[in-house]
């Protein structure tokens, strides 16, 4: 089989393996995103790349429990395994249903709220204060999201393939995957009602959620850029620059051609830049 999925190509390159990452590639079964109603990419490869990006950030263990981030990586896109997302992604946004899964899953108690908050808000992490202050959950609660369910067969395929690629990555993932398997057919009802009552005031939980949201956004976007070769090209161009680090950081923060959220992803490359 010739690899046509850029995420799979990058995963194969990063793992330094001579075969396809999965035994059988089925993008229609496990797409990493849907564009114009067409399933695209590979969710398993995306998760694998997120885990590899985590391995590349050495400072993580000094600021937050690595297993907590691994849990966030494995669960933040669970909403993409629902029937609703596959059929109508805009009506069933994956981050909302992923957060709802975390809140409703049986067997998940420790760090439930940190994981749910970071999953719900990780796309907007760089505006977390404004988002949380203006009651993002109230806004979400006002939208008439429907009821949907995880598709058990797709969940099992996801688990099997993630386990397979993790043989090379070697992360501690079995506990989270067992949780997912035990809730493989979970029905996700009335997210608006559930989120309306979801309010966390414990400062310790909020602080962890903020850090987790930042890291999840960073890892998610660094991995997602490989879908269209965008990140690899930008990273290569980035490394060619000979500016001093402070000059480079200033350019990243002030260049109007770089989207606000993407600036943080580029700043995360500075440690690699300094090693060159």
Predicted regions mapped to residue ranges:
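Acidic/His-rich, divalent-metal-binding segments that scaffold phosphate/diphosphate chemistry
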Residues: 1-90
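Divalent-cation-assisted or electrostatically stabilized phosphate/pyrophosphate-binding catalytic cores
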Residues: 7-10, 15, 35-42, 86-105, ...
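Divalent metal-dependent catalytic cores for phosphoryl transfer on phosphate-bearing substrates
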Residues: 31-36, 59-238
């Amino acid at each position: 089989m010739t690899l046509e999925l850029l995420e799979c190509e990058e995963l194969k390159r990063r793992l330094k393996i001579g075969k396809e990452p999965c035994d059988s590639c089925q993008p229609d079964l496990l797409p990493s995103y849907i564009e114009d109603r067409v399933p695209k990419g590979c969710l398993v490869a995306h998760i694998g790349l997120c885990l590899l990006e985590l391995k590349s950030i050495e400072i993580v263990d000094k600021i937050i429990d690595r297993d907590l981030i691994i849990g966030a990586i494995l669960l933040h896109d669970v909403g993409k395994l629902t029937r609703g997302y596959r059929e109508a992604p805009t009506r069933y946004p994956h981050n909302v249903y992923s957060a709802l899964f975390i809140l409703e899953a049986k067997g998940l108690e420790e760090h439930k709220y940190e994981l749910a908050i970071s999953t719900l808000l990780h796309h907007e992490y760089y505006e977390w204060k404004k988002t949380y202050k203006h009651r993002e959950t109230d806004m979400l609660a006002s939208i008439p999201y429907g009821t949907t369910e995880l598709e058990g067969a797709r969940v099992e395929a996801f688990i099997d393939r993630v386990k397979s690629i993790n043989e090379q990555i070697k992360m501690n993932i079995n506990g989270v995957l067992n949780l997912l398997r035990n809730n493989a057919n979970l029905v996700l009802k009335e997210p608006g009602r559930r989120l309306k009552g979801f309010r966390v005031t414990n400062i310790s939980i909020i602080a962890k959620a903020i850090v987790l949201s930042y890291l999840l956004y960073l890892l998610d976007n660094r991995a997602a850029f490989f879908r269209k070769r965008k990140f690899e090209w930008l990273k290569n161009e980035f490394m060619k620059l000979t500016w001093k680090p402070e000059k480079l950081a200033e350019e990243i923060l002030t260049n109007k051609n770089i989207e606000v959220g993407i600036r943080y992803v580029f700043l995360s490359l500075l440690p690699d830049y300094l090693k060159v």
